[in-house]
Amino acid sequence: MVENAFDLMPRDSVRLGILSLLAGQREDGCVPDRLQADGLAVYSAGPVGAPLGDPPTDNSQFMVKLVADYVRATGDLDFFRAVAGKLVRAMDFSSRSRDGLVTIDPARPHSPYGFTDTIAKTGELLFSSLLYREASRKLATLFEKAGDAARAGDFGARAGSIERNLGSLWDKKAGMFLAASVDCRQIDIWGNAYAVYAGFPLASKKKRILGFLARNYSRIIYRGQVRHLPEPESWEKTLIPITPGTYQNGAYWGTASGWVAFALTERWPDLAARLVRALITDYKRRGAYECINLNYEKLKDYVVSVVNPLGALRRTAAEYRMD
C-alpha cells in the first residue's frame, strides 16, 4: 500500500508501522512476516500453530522497499539512517546462491514469494531474486545519499550479481523466465511481467516476454485478472493441498494486472487497455476479490487487488503521457 497509495494513508501511521515491524526483528536479522493485533510478531506464512516452514524469501526485500518508499515520499533521510543497520541485517538474512540469486534448499521447502506462499518452489527463485535486486538498488541509492559509499557499493554489487546471473532461469524455447531452478521449474507469468515493470535489464529478452504475454493473453487473463501460470497448468508441488484452478494454484488475481498492463503498453497498448477495461468493469460489477475463476471467488474487498493496479496505472499514465 505504501508503494502504490501513500497519498491515501496518514504519514505518521506509515512511520509507526515500519518501526513496529522492525521492533520485531529477530537476532538473526529475520523481520516479521506480519504483526497480529495483539502485537505478536509472526515470521512464517500460514497459521501461527502450523507455519509453512521457514520464513518466506521476500520479507527482507519488502521491508527495504517499505522504508525506501517512505523516504521517497517524505524526504526523511534521517529516518533511513536510523534504521539502516536493521535493513542490512534483514538483507543478510536472505539465503542466496553463489550467483547471488535468492534460493530455497530443495531438502527444506518453505514459502517463497508471498503471493505464492503455498507453492513449493525450490532452488534459485525468480520473483524473490527480482525483489532482492530491486531492494539492493534502493539501498545502494539511499546509502549513497547518506554518504556511506562502502555500503552503497556493497548493495550495488549484490544487485549486479543478480542482473548478470538471472539468465540461468531463462527458458530459450518459451522466451520466458522460469519460476525456480529445481521444483516448480515452470513459466512464471507474474515474475516475467514484474521483471519488465521493475526495470530489470532484459535486453533482447524483453521483446520475447512481451510477445509471450500478448500471444497468450487468453491463457493468462480472465476478467482483467492474471494467472500465475498459463492455463491450464497448475504448480508441480504445493506446500499444502490446493485444488487446481483455485487460490495460488490457477486462479486469476488483480494483484498482477497492473504489471501486465504496463508491460503490454509498450508494444500493444490496445491490448493493455482491453485488460484494464475488463478489470475495472469486473470490480464495478462484482467487487475486488483476492482471486477469481469461473464459478469461484475468494475474499472480497481485497485491498492489494485495488492498490497494485492503481499504482501501475498511475505510472503507466505518467510514463506514456496518457490523460
Where are these regions (language model features)?
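Aromatic-rich carbohydrate-recognition surfaces in CAZymes
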Residues: 1-101, 126-129, 254-264, 272, ...
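Glycine-rich, flexible loop/turn motifs
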Residues: 27, 31, 111, 115, ...
